[in-house]
Structure formats: C-alpha cells, structure tokens
Design a protein with these regions (language model features):
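Glycine-rich, proline-tolerant flexible connector loops at the mouths of alpha/beta enzymes
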Residues: 12-21, 32-58, 86-94, 155-165
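Hydrophobic or amphipathic alpha-helical targeting/insertion segments
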Residues: 72-113
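Alpha-helix-loop-beta-strand connector modules within alpha/beta enzyme cores
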Residues: 45-67, 100-112, 174-183, 265-272
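Catalytic alpha/beta core domains of metabolic enzymes, predominantly
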Residues: 117, 125-282
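Active-site mouth loops of central-metabolism enzymes
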Residues: 4-23, 42, 61-69, 90, ...
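Glycine-enriched alpha-helix->loop->beta-strand junction motifs that scaffold or abut catalytic
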Residues: 35, 58-61, 78-85, 106-108, ...
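Glycine-rich phosphate-binding active-site loops on the catalytic face of alpha/beta enzymes
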Residues: 35-37, 80-95, 187, 210-224
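N-terminal amphipathic alpha-helix/helix-capping segment at the start of soluble metabolic enzymes
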Residues: 1-13, 106, 263-269
Length: 284
C-alpha cells in the first residue's frame, strides 16, 4: 500500500531489456536485496508486455509497467499481471484509447501512475505560463487526472518530474495543496552517480522534509543499485527511516596518522549488511 500514511517506499527501474526475462529477474533480485521495494520495467514491445507474467512469477516486489505511446502495451501488461502501470495520457492517444486502458485497470483494480515531465509539457501550457514552469506541470498533471476521473476511476498515483531541482520542489508544493492522491517523487535525468545523488538529495530532502511524497526514486545514470543506496541514505538522513548503521567519519587533516579514508570505506562496506540495526558508528 502506498499513500494514506503508509511508509515511503523506494523504487528503481531496470535497465535490462524486459524481453530478456532471466537478465531482468537477476537485476530485480539484486535491487531487492539492496532494499528496492517497487520496480519499474520498460514495456516498449508486445514481447516485453508478455514477459511481465514470467517476471512476476520470479520476483517478490511489485512490478510497474512503463508505457509510452501504445495503449495496447498497457492492456497487455495488465493482462499479464503487472501491479501498476505508468502512463502519460497525453501520449497514449485518443480518449477512446485512454478509456480502453482505464477499463482494464478498473476491472482488475490496477493503479495507474499518471506521469508528466518538464521535457514534454504541452505547447499551450508553455505559452500560457511563458515557458516550462512548476505551475504548468501541475496544471498538466491535474488535467490528465481529470480525464481518468471522468471515466469513473481514481486508483491513481501522480508523478511530476523535472531535471530542474527547484522547479520540481515547487511543483510538489503546489500539487500537494491541490490533491490527496499519492505522489511519486524524484528528480528526473539527474545525472551520474555523484552529481545525480547530490541533486536528488537536495530535491528530495526539500520535498520529503515538508511531508510530501509517498514513493521515491533517485534517478541515476549508473548501476540501479546505487539508486537504492542513495535513496536509503536520504530517508535515513531525514529521519524518515531508522534502520541501518550510520557511519560518521573524520574528514582527515594533516594530523591524520593512519589510512583513515581506506578504513572508513571498509567499515562502510562491512556495515551495509546490517539493516536490522539502528546504530551510529564513528571512524576517527
């Protein structure tokens, strides 16, 4: 369960070809072991949609199908047992096609994540607000939510993404004041492991620190396991999660007489496997 006061869950996305079931399952297993709680898989082909069924049999966390453009892929993924679908109603096509997706979701009570992105904001909203803005993103998201609500379905999650950290923060402040739907939070296209982790820590810290957000993803250009490590650290730093060992260590100076950097790195690796402990370890 997400939203409604439930704990914030950590999400990632596979970068394997979903059609390659063995590779995808292997990656999901590694992510789950690292602490991933929801996994999203790209579904660009009918073969990928059909692979969802076999993937579901072999993993232990909810699977989300990421759909673009072809509404039939969303339907096929749901027919193959996916737990949630992510769509942008604006690129699915006509209202009839959106309704076809909503009807299947309604029949199976499958949540729909409605996603909007600053990189694809509608031209009329860009013109209305004089550029890509937080206000435009929120209006776009709520317009798409209303389309689905008008089809008598409200099992929805909203996602507003931007690579502009402060725009993303502002958009979440605005939309959280306008709706009670669960929000998936992340800074999209944030960069490589170092840069992306820092941008995500700033953005997610500002958003989650206001009590906004129900699921998170730290989007990185790198090994998805690094996304989980960063997300867990962000949640622990904010005091949202208490499990795991926190390492504090001296930044070193001219008085340092041992290999403190190497020692701190070794301790951090050793401590990573003790999620059940809530400790602070000092390396000085």
């Amino acid at each position: 369960m997400i939203g409604g006061g439930n704990p914030i869950l950590i999400q990632s996305m596979t970068n394997t070809r979903t059609e390659n079931v063995d590779a995808t399952v292997e990656q999901i297993a590694g992510l789950e072991a690292a602490g991933c709680e929801i996994i999203r898989c790209a579904v660009p082909t009918m073969e990928a949609a059909q692979a969802i069924g076999e993937i579901k049999k072999r993993v232990h966390i909810p699977v989300v199908a990421d759909i673009h453009f072809d509404y039939r892929l969303a339907i096929a993924a749901m027919e193959n047992g996916v737990d949630k679908i992510r769509i942008n109603p604006g690129n699915i096509g006509s209202l009839d096609r959106i309704k076809a997706v909503v009807d299947v979701a309604k029949e199976r009570n499958i949540p729909i994540r409605v996603g909007v992105n600053s990189g694809s904001l509608e031209k009329n909203l860009v013109e209305k607000y004089g550029g890509v803005t937080a206000e435009g993103l929120v209006e776009s998201a709520l317009d798409k939510v209303r389309i689905i609500e008008d089809m008598d379905y409200d099992n929805l999650v909203i996602s507003i993404k931007s690579s502009n950290v402060m725009m993303c923060v502002r958009a979440h402040e605005l939309i959280s004041a306008k709706t009670d739907y669960p929000l998936h939070v992340g800074i999209t296209e944030s960069g490589t492991v170092l840069t992306g982790s820092i941008k995500s820590a700033v953005g997610l810290g500002l958003i989650l620190g206001q009590g906004i957000g129900d699921t998170i993803r730290v989007s990185l250009t790198g090994d998805p396991v690094e996304e989980i490590k960063a997300a867990k650290t962000i949640l622990k730093t904010l005091g949202i999660r208490q499990s795991g060992i926190e390492i504090v260590s001296c930044p070193t100076c001219g008085r340092t007489s041992i290999d403190l950097i190497g020692l701190a790195e070794k301790v951090e690796k050793l401590a990573a496997g003790y999620e059940e402990l809530n400790l602070k370890l000092a390396v000085m």
